[in-house]
Amino acid sequence: MRLDYALFNQHLANSREKAKALVLKNRVLVNKIVISKPSFIVKEGDQIELIATNPFVSRAGEKLGAFLENHFIDFKEKVVLDVGASKGGFSQVALLKGAKRVLCVDVGKMQLDEGLKNDQRIECYEECDIRGFKTPEKIDLVLCDVSFISLYCILEAIVPLSGEFLALFKPQFEVGRAAKRNKKGVVMDKEAILNALENFKNHLKTKDFQILTIQESLVKGKNGNVEFFIHFKRA
C-alpha cells in the first residue's frame, strides 16, 4: 500500500491530500527512517510514525535538516562520525536519514540527548578530543560541528578517518579577534567573513580535497551568526 494511503487508513491524517503533504514535508517515519515519497510502498508490519513539528533535539539538527532539504547526501546504511556531537542534533538527523550507526565524539560530558544515548545505533565518546580519537571502524562520512576552536585545528585529525566530510564553518571562530562584532559576539564584518571562508576553501584545495557544496546555513547560529555548510571529499 502507498504510504500516503496508509497514513489515511491508519487515521494519522484526515485526508489523502494531507497525508501526501506530511510525507513531502519529511514528517513521516517508516521503521524510524524519514520517507519523502508519498508513493513509497509500505509492507505489512512496517511501523509508521509522525514526527513532531520540531523534532530536533538541538538547533544543530535544525541546521542540518534544513540543509539536507536542498542538498542530497546519502546516509543510508553508512557509518557516520559526528565530531562535536553535543546534544546530538547532527547524529539524530543522520539516523533519520538512514545511517547504520553514528559515533558521537565530544570534549564535553553528559550532553547527548538521553533518547539518542539509549539508541543502539549510537556510540558515545564523551570527554574525547577528536585530535586524540582513534577507531578501527571504517567511517563513511564525517559530520563536524565544533565551537570555540577553528576547523584548521582539527582538520588534520579528521582527514585520515574518512573520505567524505560535511563541516559547519563558523566565522565567529575563524575570523580572528580583530573582526568587528556586536555585544553578542556576532561578527558584523561581512568582508572578513567572506575572506575567512575563501581562505578555508583554498586551504582545502591545497590538501587535495574536492569541494562539492558551500551553502549558507538557513538556520543561523544561536546569537545570530551566519554559518556555512561545506561538503567536501578526497579528490
Predicted ranges, named:
Residues 1-46, 79:
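A basic, amphipathic helix-loop patch mediating RNA/tRNA/ribosome contacts
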Residues 76-86:
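Conserved class I S-adenosyl-L-methionine
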Residues 87-98:
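Conserved SAM-binding loop of SAM-dependent methyltransferases across substrates and taxa
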Residues 152-166:
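A short glycine-rich, Lys/Arg-flanked "PGG" loop and its adjoining helix->strand segment in the class I
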Residues 162-176:
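Conserved beta-strand signature within the Rossmann-like core of class I S-adenosyl-L-methionine
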Residues 172-215:
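C-terminal substrate-binding/active-site "lid" region of AdoMet-derived donor-dependent transferases
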Residues 216-235:
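Core SAM-dependent methyltransferase catalytic element
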